[in-house]
Regions:
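Interfacial loop-to-transmembrane junctions
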Residues: 190-192, 224-244
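Residue-level signature of transmembrane alpha-helical entry/exit and packing/kink sites
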Residues: 11-19, 85, 89, 108, ...
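Functional transmembrane core segments of multi-pass inner-membrane proteins
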Residues: 109, 114-221, 255, 261
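Alpha-helical membrane-inserting segments
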Residues: 29, 33, 95, 99, ...
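Short, strongly hydrophobic alpha-helical membrane anchors
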Residues: 1-11, 258-261
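Long, charge-rich boundary regions
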Residues: 9, 71, 75-143
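Membrane-proximal soluble regions of multi-pass membrane proteins
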Residues: 29-85
Length: 261
């Protein structure tokens, strides 16, 4: 249901709530990703300052506002808090707003929001330890399965197109990586990246999955040039490309096909 059916004030309130939820989930998945990367229990452990170990209270855990109110420093020891925490909260908040504007109040919007949170979490882990835990991949697959009955696409079509997208993109990257591994004599693409391509392919379907693959390579190349490193974690690039394609990939595919039809 498009939010345009509501009056302007209600539309604004919906978008504000979407931004707030995005910021909250960004805080959660950023924390979870950081703890997993450090080998800590992300379920039972309480949030603490990484520098002084002080247990954080409720006022220290309000997304965006807690960071701004302390000028990006720990309230107890004055240690600097990475600005990446603030950036992730703002960006995911904006992304949630875009999801609502694109899909309205729908299962597609909720699916997109949930997947973007998972992608943020696994990107944090990949950036820290160059590894994508299988738990994120499994969670993504489960998310795809449980939302099939609620999206607008007929369930059988959703299953067929999703599996085809996952197998084509994930399987294709597996074959290509094996070929490059043989040629170069070293690993070109990690197993976690291939699994991630499969998982995101379930959501994107074949055409948008291919577009996401191209965007992933472009974003990855941008990271290489920007960071001036020969080796980078590819998970964040795949995640960024997936999030963009989820919102606007169908438009790009329709435009491209329209050039030939």
């Amino acid at each position: 249901m498009s939010i345009t059916v509501f009056d302007p004030l209600t539309q604004v309130m919906i978008l504000i709530f979407a931004f707030a939820f995005g910021a909250v989930f960004a805080s959660f998945f950023t924390c979870m990703g950081g703890r997993i990367a450090q080998g800590r229990d992300w379920v039972k452990e309480r949030s603490t300052c990484d520098s002084c170990g002080h247990v954080l209270g409720a006022r220290d855990l309000v997304p965006i506002f807690s960071y701004l109110s302390t000028n990006g420093k720990c309230r107890y020891c004055g240690a600097k808090i990475p600005i990446s925490c603030l950036v992730s909260e703002v960006l995911l908040g904006i992304y949630y707003v875009l999801c609502v504007l694109r899909f309205g109040i729908s299962a597609e919007a909720l699916r997109c929001m949930a997947l973007s949170g998972l992608l943020l979490g696994l990107s944090i882990v990949d950036l820290e330890i160059y590894e994508i835990p299988d738990g994120f991949i499994i969670a993504g697959i489960v998310l795809w399965v449980i939302t099939i009955p609620f999206v607008q696409t007929p369930w059988l079509t959703e299953v067929k197109q999703g599996l085809l997208g996952g197998l084509l993109i994930g399987g294709g990257m597996l074959v290509l990586s094996l070929i490059f591994d043989q040629i170069s004599g070293k690993e070109s693409l990690g197993g976690g990246d291939i699994k991630l391509f499969f998982m995101t392919g379930l959501f994107l379907k074949p055409a948008c999955g291919l577009l996401s693959l191209i965007l992933s390579c472009m974003v990855g190349l941008g990271f290489v040039l920007l960071l001036k490193k020969s080796k980078i974690p590819f998970g964040p690039a795949i995640s960024i490309a997936t999030c963009v394609t989820l919102l606007y990939g169908s438009y790009a595919v329709e435009w491209y096909l329209g050039l030939f039809l």
